[in-house]
């Protein structure tokens, strides 16, 4: 019972109109089929009367055939009109739904615009850009520090390689033998000691000659 008093929506009205138009189209199609059947019967009657030579009957039947064909042609016109109305109804329904969708979208956009503060949005974007720049600077500093560490390590390794090469050239190994180098040469006179001894002997001989001692 509640459905009887329920207010019809636009969609309900359009659906009813479409049902009525489809029903009208079916009726027109049936009527045209009946007229075509009568048309064939009249054509047979006219041929029959013509064979018997009944001219008056042929004239009467011919007039009926003309009227029937006019009526059949009118069914085509009516059918075309019904089809056009059905198409217009579908177009109107589509336009109505599109308008409804646009209205809903407009309301949604309006609600979003009310909640969205342009100043806050701009500030958020600026803060994001600022923090992003900080992150990039921090990352760059970390990369520079790591590069310095690795470069220093490389320089230390290069320096050690040079020291090892020099020690190897003079016959001293770095693996603990540098401490033994002085003791190994302890029994040998140094260059400075030998030179000092030579100078001392010459000085003694000079002094002896000065004294007349051979």
Swiss-Prot record:
Q: Which InterPro entries match?
A: Snf7_fam (IPR005024)
Which sequence ranges form a coiled-coil region, renumbered to this chain? 25-55
What stretch of residues is annotated with the motif MIT-interacting motif?
202-212
- Judging by the UniProt lineage, the source's domain of life is Eukaryota
Ranges annotated as biased composition (Polar residues): 190-199
Any one Pfam family match given in the protein's UniProt record, by short name: Snf7
Task: Tell me where in or outside the cell this protein is found.
Answer: Cytoplasm, Cytosol; Late endosome membrane
Membrane topology label: Peripheral membrane protein
Q: How does it assemble?
A: Probable core component of the endosomal sorting required for transport complex III (ESCRT-III). ESCRT-III components are thought to multimerize to form a flat lattice on the perimeter membrane of the endosome.
Report what the protein is called.
Charged multivesicular body protein 2b
Species: Gallus gallus
């Amino acid at each position: 019972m509640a459905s009887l008093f329920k207010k019809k929506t636009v969609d309900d009205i359009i659906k009813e109109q479409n049902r009525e138009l489809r029903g009208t189209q079916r009726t027109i199609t049936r009527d045209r089929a009946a007229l075509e059947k009568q048309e064939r019967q009249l054509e047979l009657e006219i041929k029959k009367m013509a064979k018997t030579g009944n001219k008056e009957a042929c004239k009467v039947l011919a007039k009926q055939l003309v009227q029937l064909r006019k009526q059949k042609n009118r069914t085509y016109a009516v059918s075309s009109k019904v089809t056009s109305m059905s198409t217009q109804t579908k177009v109107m329904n589509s336009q109505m739904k599109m308008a409804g969708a646009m209205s809903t979208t407009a309301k949604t956009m309006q609600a979003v615009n009310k909640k969205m503060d342009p100043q806050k949005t701009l500030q958020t974007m600026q803060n994001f850009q600022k923090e992003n720049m900080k992150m990039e600077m921090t990352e760059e500093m970390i990369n520079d520090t790591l590069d310095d560490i690795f470069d220093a390590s490389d320089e230390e390794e290069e320096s050690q390689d040079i020291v090892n090469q020099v020690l190897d050239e003079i016959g001293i190994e770095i693996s603990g033998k540098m401490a033994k180098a002085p003791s190994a040469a302890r029994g040998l006179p140094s260059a400075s000691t030998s030179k000092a001894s030579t100078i001392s002997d010459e000085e003694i001989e000079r002094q002896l000659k000065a004294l007349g001692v051979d």
